[in-house]
Amino acid sequence: MASSKKQKKKMHRPHNRKLMIRDLPVGAAYLLHPSLRGILLSRPKRWNSGSPSHRIAVNLVRKYKKQLKPRVLPFFCDHCRLASRTLLHIKEHVCDKEEKRKAARKEESRKFADYDVTNEIKLATNSEKQWRFNAMAVLEQTLRPNKVAPKKVEIEEDPGIDQLLDSEPDQEFYDAQEQEFEDDTPHYPIKDVLVPSSQPPRPKVTLKSSECLGHNDAGVFCFNCKGSFDSYNQFQLHLNEDYNDGKCNRALPEYYYVQRHDRTHMFDKRYKHSVQHHKPIKRDISHIQCTLCKAVNFASTGDLYAHMVKCASSTTNEDKESAIDCPTAFGYGMPPSFNACQYVFPDPAKERYSRNSRGSKEPVES
């Protein structure tokens, strides 16, 4: 019974087609040009992944493969730089440059085998005589450093036992020392020649024991009840339910160590320092002067305002109009604080003198 689905026929390549780069084995990649070796070495993976990153990578590879390759012959020899269109020509040719390199390496090895290192050995063993040729410099410059052995320095091992040195001075040294400090002046003990002091004797001072200095130890401060304790054990005992109605027992234990004795006296009430702020200058009403009639020494603020209104209404300008009836920027009429008074401490106009008459001290009218 014939199947309903059509079976796909496999495509067979003709035998007389041209040789493709993909048809070459992977081991023949060294015979290709370096720019064409990626085509042979990049094989497709057996399993394809459907992830977006894999598709992006595959598309980039395909895009790179579609790029135009350099117009070079496909088969190439790295040693002699020979290129050809046929694989057999490159595979069976004789590389002259490689033979020359082998001969050069053989000649160099022969030269090194016959190299004489006797001079370097002498310099390395007698390096202390010639300071410019030390052992390390000889080893760096010689062609066969394995044949040169520098001179070994023998270092004595530490015996581990203290050795007594004969450093006792001679008797002549002691005699010379006595002659140097000889003095013919008779000397007496200090208690016999000491003059008694006229000052009263100082009182005896006894140092405090360590038990008395125990109050200077660090204490513990509790943040919950704001209490200080002598030690951490006392702080831990107050966390019971019986203490402070159990507030510290229910709260998280939060504490820090403090020093109970204030050596700097910063928190001592006897050395309390208060910041003194500058008080603002209080201006007296008697310091205010009227700018129209030059009146001063008002008893109160009410008297000043009453005088300003009365003085402004009594003064008239050229048009026979009162200053209080003239319109201003503040409205109709002159306000009390508009160019009506000024402070004087004291009046500087009365203390100025003219510059022209230096000898005469006549005040200048303002």
UniProtKB/Swiss-Prot annotation:
**Can you name this protein?**
Uncharacterized protein R07G3.7
Organism source for this protein?
Caenorhabditis elegans
